[in-house]
Amino acid sequence: MTKSSFHKLLLGSVLMLLPFTVQAQVVLKNWTIEDHSGKVKILVSSDTLEITAPDGLTLWYNQRLTGDYEIGYRVKMLMQGGKYDRLSDLNCFWGANDPEYPDNLFARSEWRNGIFQRYKTLSLFYVGYGGNHNSTTRFRQYFAKAADTSDAIARPVIKEYTDKAHLLIPNKWYDIKIRVEKESQLTVSTAKSCSDCRLKRMRETDISDSAYWKTTHYLQAFR
């Protein structure tokens, strides 16, 4: 067996053993980067992405997710005295669509470019974990309005927490699960304390009129 074929075999074995979402982390071509600073650094180590972002960054998983699905990942907010270390905004978008380009979420990718206000132009669901300098955790729905639309109209808060139990702890691994079930409910929780960290339960009838169920779903990790 040649060295080249061994590497190909090894890679294939690793990818088969890893969960679907972890496979995507290994292959950067499955991610679309919207980086306001132009200086983001992403290091790949085994099944982990280490991200250093000087300014606004949106990292989209660019494969389509449809039907019922669960998004799961582990994440840590590193606080080690680095220049860009900041304990705030462990955020996630999902169920995202652009009504201006319903068949291509990334048509305005260069325009959005990690600038947070511009994501108001999308329809999606959002969790801002430890937002506002780690003082709030909020679950919102976005309604695809103009970027300068007030938050109350463009992205109203569905549920908010301000207690310490729902805020970020530095250098802690979080097991995040987001489950979407069209026929039953939508939940957002941390795996280790699901009952405490659930943000919202919504029956299908509450959101069936939105573009969420009618078009393609995407996963986004925002930091």
Q: Which residues does each PLM region occupy?
A:
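Bacterial N-terminal signal peptides that target proteins for export
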Residues: 1-11
